[in-house]
């Protein structure tokens, strides 16, 4: 896989991961918060907070993305709700 160096690369990696986890019917994938991981001084990856819609529900997922190869090292569901 390709290195993930900036927000555009993170958006591509997050989109691929969300579609792999939740299926191709997801839409409106947005990276809401993007932080270096573990911190700014020794960055090894990205902590991305991502929202998207699927089957009438809005999901918020936290993804840890390795900077060197774009692998998702952790994916965690934060919230699932019916949008207003």
Q: What kind of feature is each model-predicted range?
A:
Residues 1-35:
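Short, non-transmembrane alpha-helical segments in secretory-pathway proteins
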Residues 20-24, 55, 82:
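Hydrophobic alpha-helical elements and their junctions with loops/disorder across both membrane
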Residues 22, 30, 43, 75-77, ...:
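Generic alpha-helix signal with a bias toward terminal, lower-confidence helices
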Residues 25, 37-39, 84:
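Generic low-complexity segments that are intrinsically disordered, proline-rich and/or Lys/Arg-biased
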Residues 29-68:
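Exposed beta-strand-loop-beta-strand "reactive/processing" segments of non-cytosolic proteins
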Residues 62-84:
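A short, surface-exposed interaction/processing loop segment used at functional sites
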């Amino acid at each position: 896989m390709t290195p993930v160096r900036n927000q555009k690369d993170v958006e591509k990696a997050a989109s691929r991961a969300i579609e792999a986890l939740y299926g191709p019917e997801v839409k409106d994938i947005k990276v809401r918060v993007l932080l270096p991981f573990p911190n700014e001084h020794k960055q090894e990856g990205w902590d991305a907070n991502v929202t998207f819609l699927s089957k009438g529900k809005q999901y918020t997922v936290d993804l840890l993305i390795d900077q060197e190869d774009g692998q998702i090292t952790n994916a965690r569901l934060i919230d699932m709700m019916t949008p207003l």
